[in-house]
């Protein structure tokens, strides 16, 4: 499988975070056209760290968790929990306005 990332995002947040940001952006864009999960006016993606390590076998659980933490701390992503079952602690991710700007800018450079 081929993975892409934006070098400007990688410089600021790290290569792992840039790879995850592009993956999440693609998933959320696809979801927004198929069956959007809307909460708080944003399209959210429910995805556990364990699930992401399945898509990225070259990243460990901790590397994935740390990369997501950097994106949340850098205000590229926001994290929430909208699970129907209370004890389900799977996180949901959405791009902030700043994150949407970064990803749209990234797409503009690649086209």
Where in this protein do the model-derived segments appear?
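Short recognition helix of helix-turn-helix/winged-helix DNA-binding domains
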Residues: 1-54, 97-100
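Intrinsic disorder/low-complexity signal
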Residues: 5, 61, 83, 87, ...
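Long, compositionally biased, intrinsically disordered segments
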Residues: 14-15, 79, 104-108
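Winged helix-turn-helix DNA-binding recognition segment
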Residues: 28-91
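Charged low-complexity intrinsically disordered patches
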Residues: 69, 96-111
């Amino acid at each position: 499988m081929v993975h892409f990332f934006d070098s400007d995002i990688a410089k600021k947040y790290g290569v792992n975070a840039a790879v995850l940001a592009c993956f999440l952006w693609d998933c959320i864009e696809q979801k927004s056209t198929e069956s959007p999960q809307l909460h708080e006016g944003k399209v959210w993606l429910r995805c556990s760290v364990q699930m992401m390590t399945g898509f990225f076998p070259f990243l460990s659980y901790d590397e994935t968790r740390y990369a997501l933490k950097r994106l949340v701390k850098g205000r590229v992503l926001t994290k929430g929990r909208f699970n129907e079952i209370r004890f389900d602690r799977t996180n949901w991710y959405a791009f902030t306005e700043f994150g949407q700007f970064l990803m749209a800018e990234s797409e503009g450079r690649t086209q």
